[in-house]
Curated annotation (Swiss-Prot):
Signal peptide: none annotated. Part of the 30S ribosomal subunit. Contacts proteins S5 and S12. This is Small ribosomal subunit protein uS8. GO terms for biological process: translation. GO terms for molecular function: rRNA binding; structural constituent of ribosome. The keyword Ribosomal protein applies. The gene is rpsH. It comes from Kocuria rhizophila (strain ATCC 9341 / DSM 348 / NBRC 103217 / DC2201).
Length: 132
């Protein structure tokens, strides 16, 4: 069966594994998901990610990050632009997640960027998700 929204599936797997205090979470690999994982690692929300071969295709494995007393580094994840309702933001009207404490992940003409990076480059795009 085909998946209509692979990004939402990735974020749901991440949210569920984080809530259950799992150390890792695996999902089918795609370039878009790998780029989202790179952003999450660069922003400090996950410890690491890896691409592993599977019987069919590849698997993307995320290593989740927890604090000293098993505090979650990800408080919440929300999918914004969906296949049925795309959400776009201009460079002059980029979203701020919790006053700058979280990040918005945007798909721009310059690739996937956070809201801060898109603001510096002066580009807008499709708002994929919020992470805080």
């Amino acid at each position: 069966m085909t998946m209509t929204d692979p990004v939402a599936d990735m974020l749901t797997r991440l949210r569920n594994a984080n809530s259950a205090y799992h150390d890792t979470v695996s999902m089918p690999y795609s370039k878009l998901k790998a780029r989202i994982a790179e952003i999450l690692k660069a922003e400090g929300y996950i410890a690491d990610w890896s691409e592993e071969p599977a019987r069919v295709g590849k698997t993307l494995t995320l290593s989740l990050k927890f604090g000293s007393n098993r505090e979650r580094s990800i408080a919440g994840v929300r999918r914004i632009s969906k296949p049925g309702l795309r959400v776009y933001a201009k460079s002059t009207n980029l979203p701020r997640v919790f006053g700058g404490l979280g990040i918005a992940i945007l798909s721009t003409s310059s690739g996937l960027l956070t809201d801060k990076q898109a603001g510096k480059k002066g580009v807008g795009g499709e708002v994929l998700a919020y992470v805080w």
